[in-house]
Amino acid sequence: MKDKFELVSKYSPQGDQPRAIEQLVAGLKKGLKHQTLLGATGTGKTFTVSNVIQEVNKPTLVMAHNKTLAGQLYSEFKEFFPNNAVEYFVSYYDYYQPEAYVPQSDTYIEKDASINDEIDKLRHSATAALFERRDVIIIASVSCIYGLGSPIEYGEMLVSLRVGMEISRDQLLRKLVDIQYDRNDIDFQRGRFRVRGDVVEIFPASRDEHCMRIEFFGDEIERIREVDALTGEIIGEREHVSIFPASHFVTRPDIMKKAIVNIKAELEDRLKVLRADNKLLEAQRLEQRTNYDLEMMEEMGYCSGIENYSRHLSLRPAGVTPYTLLDYFPDDFQMVIDESHVTMPQIRGMFNGDQARKQMLVDHGFRLPSALDNRPLRLEEFEKHINQIMFISATPGPYELEKNPDVIEQIIRPTGLLDPIVEIRPIQGQIDDLMDEINDRVEKNERVLITTLTKKMSEDLTNYLKEAGVKVQYLHSEVKTLERIEIIRDLRLGVYDVIVGINLLREGIDLPEVSLVAILDADKEGFLRSERSLIQTMGRAARNENGRVIMYADKMTDSMRNSIGETERRRKIQIEYNEKHGITPKTIKKEIRGIIAATSAADEREAVKQHDLSKMSKKERDVFIEGMEHEMKEAAKALDFERAAELRDALLEIKAEG
C-alpha cells in the first residue's frame, strides 16, 4: 500500500511560509484539534498546506465552498503531488432541480437532474482510493456532507480477483450484477462488462480509458490484463485487481430483503396516520409511489430516488447520522477548510434548507418520513467526524476563532507585494475626485475597481463615467457567467479601464492590473461593508505594486477602523521583511488566461456570437450544441473543470434562450 506523500515543486517555502508550516505541523503532531491559518491574499496558502500534508503524511480532505474553487484547488494539488492520489469529489449534477411540492398551487416538481459522467467517475475514483491507499488527498465541495451509501457495504461488496483464484465465469458475472454492473457486449463503457467465451472484460466505475480483461481456464482465473478499452492495446499484466461497486448505494441481497420488509412496515404505519387525518389523496399517492419503488427494488435491486430509502438500506434507526464521504476516511485523517469564513456557515446552513423542502414532500404523501434521514450532516454531527482540522482564510470567521483563538499568520507574500495604502475621503465631491483618480490610472495603463451599495448607484455611475469618455463596464448579479468572465478578461486586456459592481468579492477578481479599489459609501454598516468584506475587497488591490484603496465616507465606522488597522498592521510587517531581505515589490505578471480559464471561456463565447443561433436551422443548432457538449466533456476529461463549468453554463444559457 502506497503511503508516502511526495511534494514536487521547483519552489521552496519563502517569507512567512516556513514559520506557518512549522507551527501547523507542530500543532498537528501535538494533537491540536483545531488550527487556523490567517493567510493574506497571494501569500501561497495552498503551497503551505501542501508542505504540511507532506510532513504529517495523513489522508487529507480539503473542502471548498463551490465547484469552481474546488476545481482550482484540485489542479494545484495535482501539480504538487503528481505521484499521489489527488481526487475530486463534488456534486455530479450539471443541472439539479430537487424534488419539491408547493401546496399553495398544488404543484409537484419532480426531481430533474443531468449527471456529469466524468465527475461521477471521479467520485468513484475518490472512494476507491481511500480503500486502496493512504496517500490520498480529496478535494471536495460542501456536498461531501450529504448522505452517501454505507462504506461498510461498499467495502464488503468489492470483487477481489487474483490470478489462480478459483471462481467460475458465471459466479463472477453474478457478483458483477450484484454490485450494479450492467452487461453490454456492444456499448462498452464505465460500470459495464462484456463476455466473449472464457474472457470477461470489466470497465471499472472509477475509470474511463482502461478496462480489466479476466481470462479463465475452466473455473480458475488464468490471467488478468489491463487493456485500453478503445484500442484493445495491452497496458500491462496484473496479479490482483479490486472491482468496486458501480453505485455508492449498493446493497447486499440479504440486506435488501430486510430493507424492503422495513419499508413496507413504515408504509403501513404512515398510511394509517394519513387516513386517520382524513388525508385520503395523500395516502393513495404515497401507497402508489412507494409500491412502485418497492417493485423496482425487488426486481432490479434499485429504483429511481433510491437514496430516499438510504436509512432502511443501511438498517439505521430513525434520526441516526447518515453515512457520508467522511465515513470512508480512516480515523486518523485530517481536514482542511478553505475560505473557512464562507465554507463553515454553508456547512451550518445545509441541514435546515434540506429538511424544510423534504418535510413538505412527507406531509403531502410524496415520500415516507424516512426520506428525512437522507440528508446532509448537522454541524454537531460534522464536528464529531473531526479528528484534526485546519481552517484557511484571509479573514477567519467567528466559528474558527471560537475553536482556537491562537491564529497562525501568513502575511508576507513571496513576491514582496504589500497590502494597499488605504485613504478615507469625504463623500461630497466623490465623483469628481474619483474621475481624477481614474484618469491618473488610465495614463499609467492601470485598472480600477469601484464598489457601490446599490444597483441604481452602479448603473448611474456607469452611465456618468461612459458619458465622460471612460471605458467602463458594470458587473452585476444578472450578468451571465460567461459575460462576467469576458468582462473581467477585457478589463485585463484594456478593453475597459474600470469595472463598477456591488459585490466584487467573488473568486476570479484577483487582477494584477488593478491598482485602485474605490469603496463608495464605506461608512454604511452591513454585509458588504463589514470588517471581513472590507478586508477582502481591499485585497483586490494587493496584486499591484502601486495598490491603493480609497474609502469615501463621512464618518469612521468600527468595521472601517478595524479593517484599516488590520491592513496597516500587515503592511508594516511586510515592509519590515522586505527591508531586512532587500526585496523590491514587483507586480505579478499573470497570463491573461489565469482568471477561471477566462480566455477559453471568452473564446467559446465568441464562437457562440459568430454562429448566430437565431439564424440557424434546428439541425444546425443541434449540431452546434452537440459540438459544445463534446468540448465540455473533453475539458472535464482533461481535468480542466473550470473550463468545463463555463461551457456548461454557456450551454444552459443557449438552451434557455430556446
Curated annotation (Swiss-Prot):
Segments forming domain UVR: 622-658
Origin: domain of life: Bacteria
Keyword ATP-binding attributed: yes
Pfam families reported for this sequence: Helicase_C, ResIII, UVR, UvrB, UvrB_inter
Subcellular location field: Cytoplasm
Principal cellular location given in the protein's record: cytoplasm
SUPFAM superfamilies assigned to the protein according to its UniProt record, in alphabetical order: C-terminal UvrC-binding domain of UvrB, P-loop containing nucleoside triphosphate hydrolases
Record's keyword terms, sorted: ATP-binding, Cytoplasm, DNA damage, DNA excision, DNA repair, Excision nuclease, Nucleotide-binding, SOS response
Motif interval(s): Beta-hairpin: 92-115
Domain (Helicase C-terminal) ranges: 430-592
Sequence positions that bind ATP: G39, A40, T41, G42, T43, G44, K45, T46
GO CC entries: cytoplasm; excinuclease repair complex
UniProt cross-references to HAMAP family, sorted A to Z: UvrB
Protein family according to the UniProt entry: Belongs to the UvrB family.
Subunit structure: Forms a heterotetramer with UvrA during the search for lesions. Interacts with UvrC in an incision complex.
Function in brief: The UvrABC repair system catalyzes the recognition and processing of DNA lesions. A damage recognition complex composed of 2 UvrA and 2 UvrB subunits scans DNA for abnormalities. Upon binding of the UvrA(2)B(2) complex to a putative damaged site, the DNA wraps around one UvrB monomer. DNA wrap is dependent on ATP binding by UvrB and probably causes local melting of the DNA helix, facilitating insertion of UvrB beta-hairpin between the DNA strands. Then UvrB probes one DNA strand for the presence of a lesion.
Protein name: UvrABC system protein B
UniProt organism field: Listeria monocytogenes serovar 1/2a (strain ATCC BAA-679 / EGD-e)
